[in-house]
């Protein structure tokens, strides 16, 4: 109740879902406001939200699992899989994970929804550029390329490998690609405030979602992401030695981003939003090593960009 009161009293979210972690266990889930006002459905810990860039963490875990199985290494070069990409001989898996590959691409929306993983990859390769610059350049295309590598290494679709590596073993019942959503599922509707109307729908573009292979096309509940975090932090997805290598990098430029994790005060931070929908959907997880404590916080009506401070305050309630 303290958690919900703190969340509702904040001016960060009007509508949100939360899961709370303590000592490797989910100790609380809940929600504030409507998941879908038209259907009179309230947010709760099982409400599914679009993950946005928080999905990169899941993709990185799939890569880490393949590394643990010796099917890849952090130093494996892109040229082994996609030799036609410029500078591919000098681009490693590690650099793709950390947006240090030199690949550049804006968040673009195609005219039509892309209907297969191969179509997504083809479109991405047409739109992106590869510069040879290995400074930090954030681009979703890095994770589409990683998904393409997963496809080549395993001979399976990326969706299938994600299912086999994470979703099925962890019994995630509220995690689906946007293409698999049904009217019966508890899915959050995005909202924004327009004048006196707090229930102005803010629709996500399916065409945009279709481009975000490995980086933002999956819907997930706060409870399910908390399960993933706990499993990853306690060695259930890959050995902890590999996991710690996966989420740590030191490039000497002060930017600690590694494999979807944006570090903050030595704690792990996952964060996502959609450029065209900044006032509705946002996803965030803030957690400590070994899942000692943490908060997963998803919003479908975001009133402020200061979501991190709210997550830190909520995490302090259980740490």
Positions of the model-derived regions?
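Short, small-residue-biased leader/transition segments that mark boundaries at the very start
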Residues: 2-13
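Short aromatic/basic micro-patch
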Residues: 3, 48, 219
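A short, well-structured edge-of-sheet supersecondary motif
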Residues: 11-41, 261-263, 295-296
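Structural recognition of the beta-strand scaffold that forms the well-ordered cores
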Residues: 17-19, 50-52, 95-97, 294-298
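A short acidic/small-residue loop/turn micro-motif
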Residues: 33-37, 209, 302-303
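Active-site-proximal loop and beta-strand segments within enzyme catalytic domains
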Residues: 37-139
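Short, surface-exposed loop or secondary-structure junction motifs
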Residues: 91-270, 275-277
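Structured C-terminal helix/loop/strand segments within mature extracytoplasmic catalytic/sensor domains
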Residues: 235-236, 277-319
């Amino acid at each position: 109740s303290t958690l919900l009161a703190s969340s509702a009293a904040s001016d960060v979210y009007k509508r949100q879902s939360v899961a709370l972690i303590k000592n490797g266990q989910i100790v609380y889930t809940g929600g504030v406001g409507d998941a879908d006002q038209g259907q009179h459905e309230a947010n709760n810990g099982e409400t599914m939200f679009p993950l946005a860039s928080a999905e990169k963490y899941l993709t990185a875990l799939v890569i880490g699992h393949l590394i643990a199985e010796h099917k890849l290494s952090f130093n494996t070069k892109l040229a082994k899989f996609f030799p036609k990409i410029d500078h591919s001989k000098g681009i490693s898996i590690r650099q793709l994970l950390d947006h240090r590959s030199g690949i550049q691409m804006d968040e673009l929306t195609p005219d039509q929804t892309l209907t297969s993983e191969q179509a997504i990859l083809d479109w991405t390769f047409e739109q992106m550029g590869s510069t040879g610059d290995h400074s930090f350049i954030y681009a979703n295309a890095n994770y589409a390329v990683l998904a393409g590598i997963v496809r080549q290494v395993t001979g399976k679709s990326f969706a299938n490998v994600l299912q086999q590596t994470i979703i099925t073993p962890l019994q995630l019942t509220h995690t689906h690609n946007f293409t698999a959503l049904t009217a019966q599922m508890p899915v959050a509707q995005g909202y924004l405030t327009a004048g006196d109307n707090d229930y102005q729908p803010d629709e996500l573009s399916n065409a945009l979602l279709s481009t975000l292979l490995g980086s933002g096309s999956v819907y997930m509940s706060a409870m399910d992401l908390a399960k993933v975090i706990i499993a990853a932090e306690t060695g259930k997805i890959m050995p902890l030695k590999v996991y710690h290598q996966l989420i740590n990098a030191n490039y000497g430029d002060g930017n600690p981003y590694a494999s979807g994790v944006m570090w903050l005060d030595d704690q792990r931070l996952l964060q996502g939003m959609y450029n065209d929908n900044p006032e509705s959907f946002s996803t965030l997880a803030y957690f400590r090593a070994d899942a000692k404590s943490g908060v997963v916080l998803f919003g479908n009506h975001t009133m402020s960009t200061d979501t991190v401070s709210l997550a830190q305050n909520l995490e302090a309630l259980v740490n």
